[in-house]
């Protein structure tokens, strides 16, 4: 089995949010599921869309971003996992567009979805893959910016970042954390 048991893509449900900056984590998990010819089912108790592959669970919380922890709390109990068995994939305004950063634990960094997960699970020991969507343009409000779609001229970089995130996850599961981190920083 790979490094992680539960892979969560943070985002907001609904078509109006599909292509927004805030939903980049959601898009990565959707693509991971699609590439493995899996499909999502709704798990009402988990308040999520879930897809299973052997001992791996892909999760898209159907709560809005700020309540993402509710979905994970239930799934951790159901799957008998600890917070260290989760990989949360999320957007990060403090990273430049296209940059990826893995952290095994830490604060929410102001990200409301991650903050909800930390609060619900009562720990900061939650591995996460942060995907750069920044920087925040001068004069722009954060809430407005993250809920906007990417600009046309950013789309190639976004697709490249999604691909890098998928490659990182696949390497992580097959070859382990050390090799995946080396490839990520290369």
UniProtKB/Swiss-Prot annotation:
Residues reported to bind tRNA: 17, 64, 66
EC numbers on record: 3.1.1.29
NCBIfam families to which the protein is assigned, alphabetical: pth (TIGR00447)
Catalytic activity annotation: an N-acyl-L-alpha-aminoacyl-tRNA + H2O = an N-acyl-L-amino acid + a tRNA + H(+)
Keywords: Cytoplasm, Hydrolase, RNA-binding, tRNA-binding
Gene Ontology terms for molecular function: peptidyl-tRNA hydrolase activity; tRNA binding
Cellular component aspect of the GO annotation: cytoplasm
Highest taxon, organism lineage: Bacteria
UniProt-recorded name of the protein: Peptidyl-tRNA hydrolase
Coiled coil location: none
């Amino acid at each position: 089995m790979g490094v992680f048991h539960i892979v969560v893509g943070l985002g907001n449900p609904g078509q109006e949010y599909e292509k927004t900056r805030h939903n980049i984590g959601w898009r990565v998990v959707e693509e991971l599921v699609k590439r493995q010819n899996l499909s999502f089912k709704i798990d009402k108790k988990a308040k999520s869309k879930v897809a299973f592959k052997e001992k791996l669970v892909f999760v898209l919380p159907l709560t809005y971003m700020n309540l993402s922890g509710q979905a994970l709390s239930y799934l951790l109990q159901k799957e008998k996992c600890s917070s260290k068995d989760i990989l949360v994939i999320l957007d990060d305004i403090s990273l430049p567009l296209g940059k990826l950063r893995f952290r095994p634990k830490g604060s929410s960094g102001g990200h409301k979805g991650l903050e909800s997960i930390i609060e619900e699970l009562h720990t900061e020991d939650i591995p996460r893959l942060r995907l750069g969507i920044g920087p925040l343009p001068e004069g722009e409000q954060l809430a407005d910016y993250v809920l906007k779609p990417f600009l046309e001229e950013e789309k190639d970089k976004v697709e490249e970042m999604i691909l890098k995130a998928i490659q990182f996850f696949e390497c992580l599961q097959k070859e382990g954390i050390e090799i995946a981190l080396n490839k990520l920083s290369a």
